[in-house]
Amino acid sequence: MNLKQRIFRNSSLEMISKIVGIAAGIFLSPYLIHCLTKETYGLWVLIGSVVGYFGFTDFGVRIATGRLVAYYRARQDAAKVNHTINTSLALLTASGFVVTLLTFVLSPYFGRLFHIGPNVLHVPTAVFLCGFAVAIGLPLTVFEGCLAGYERYDFINIVEIFMIIARVGLTVWMMQLGYGILALAAINFALTVAGGSVKLLLCYRVFKPLHVAMEHIDRSTIRDTYATSIWFLILAISVRISFFTDNVVIGYFRTTGEVAVYSIAGRLAQYALIAVNAFNLVLMPVSAAYDAQADLSKQRRLLLLGTRASFAAAIFMATIFLAYGRRIIHIWVGSGFEQAAIVLAILTFPMITQASQTTTLIVMQGMAKHKNLSLIYLAEALANLVLSLILVRPLGIVGVALGTALTNTLSSLIVQPIYVCRVLSLGVADYYRKAFLPVLLATAPLVALIVGFQYVWLPQRFITMAVFCIFSAAVYFGAVYLIFFTKRGLTRVSFAT
């Protein structure tokens, strides 16, 4: 199976999983707002945003595990694969204990910290369950890393799809019975354990020599893992600050109702990035294998292929958001969220730039050349946080969105491309010309067609809007595939560097 076939198979499965997840989110968000009220839904989003920081105690080990497994697999070194998995499992089990302690400390004070009234019940228990889910889930993520290292995204995504379906079913059931955020926290905990356990069993099937035992914990592997993972951690913290701290800033300085409004726009932008990442995540084992072979020309080819696909996908999402965003939000969650359309329009620009650089991040991670890129992301994230803190008081949630947009766009359009081109010995002008210019020229007529269609017919209901978006996506991505990924494409561009 060649590169394009492997990428197509894995990215297709990843995309299906993400589509199911996005569909579930599209259904559950307005449903939970209706069942819980806007303020309580905002509280649930806030709990998830805060507890999500506990995941940083993995110190990037999960992602490093996938990278190292792919690397040693390419070298056919089963012993090192075993050492990597066992060592990572020990490290993340220790992290789980740390998260449990942090959860005990935070739970009683969460309501006081974010000015939650005493009339909202079970907040400490819900926070504890969410934190404990992170603690239990940390060591289980090692086995997902193993599956990713072996490029078994089919197993990963089948499990994820079943977990998503179960989450939707259980959520609807609990809401119908009249339960609140405590039930949501319990569902999250149960499914975290169930999904991780299934991936553990699948890992045994994929890597038959796997033997979980203390004797396989290796000190040299600890050094290798942390040498790789610490920069994954900085990346994860930076991304979290850039895209998820906004809810915490708004929750602290404003209200949970405004958290709910911002989260609707942020969720749409996040869905777009998830869709793009579905393609790119499967590239890291490929890049790691090329790194093991010391093949720089293939890394350049992989970068250009991934960037063009990511940028084309981002342009489609941006077109839909800018032309139809206000209508989509109104159809989706109803009245009371009008300001979310303004926030979405602002967040669309960092969504495009961030999506266009997703392949850069993945390739640098695969090559273990992401140290400097991590520092770039960290500087961007800190600037974003400072701007958001400055702008949240005078401009509210719009100011928070502007802080994200300004810093991310500057970093993704200028700083990151310069760095990756230097690492891969690729001319910056060649990079822009081969990765971005053909996509802009080829997709311009398609974008004009989608935007102009609103003057002919504007969808008024959820089902008609969904059909319109699906039809537009089919036409757009079908044309993009014919143009860029077939031998007879009209504007086929050479990958020669």
Question: What are these language model-derived features?
Answer:
Residues R9-G25, L184-K199, C203, R219-A289, ...:
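Transmembrane helical elements of multi-pass membrane transporters/channels
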Residues L3-Y71, G96-F104, A133, M163-V168, ...:
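Signature of the first transmembrane helix
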Residues M1-I7, K199-F243, V286, D291-R301, ...:
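Interhelical loop/hinge segments that connect adjacent transmembrane helices in multipass membrane
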Residues P124, F128, I158-V206, D224, ...:
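Hydrophobic alpha-helical transmembrane segments
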Residues K4-S11, A135-E160, L177-L182, C203, ...:
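Membrane-interface junctions at transmembrane-helix termini in multi-pass inner-membrane proteins
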Residues M1-I26, A79-T87, L121-P124, E151, ...:
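N-terminal membrane topogenesis motif
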Residues C421-Y431, L449-T497:
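Membrane-proximal transmembrane or re-entrant/amphipathic helices at the cytosolic face
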